[in-house]
Amino acid sequence: MSGQSESIAAIATAFGSAGVGIVRVSGPLAKRIGETLTGQSLKARHAIHAHLRDGAGDILDDAVVLYFQGPQSYTGEDVLELQAHGNPALLNAILRECRRLGARDARPGEFTERAFLNEKRDLEQAEAGADLISGQSE
């Protein structure tokens, strides 16, 4: 494993309003961030429904929350997925809370980079994923 010491976070769904939007966190703080936002204990590969709360205790949204313990995750690190309503302002508020709790903004492609560095994806798979995401044709 690459031994990444920083936790990263990003909105993982396309920009714009949608029924569901996902905020993803990867790194050593992922579980703690999830437990702080939900007020619940998280178990690996177990989905929960929870209110996500900000630092003042106010409810941000209802969400489905999934925690994947590394190395059994996409990046090979601890990963948190917060599946909330897809309002961009709401997703940005959730992302702000993740930053407040210690994660930094992920660079474009950084989740896949970590997957590659942790030998969860080979170069061909990483490049194919990037091509799929940036593709403009059918």
Describe each model-derived feature in a short phrase.
Residues 1-138:
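A glycine-rich (often HGG/GG-containing) alpha/beta subdomain
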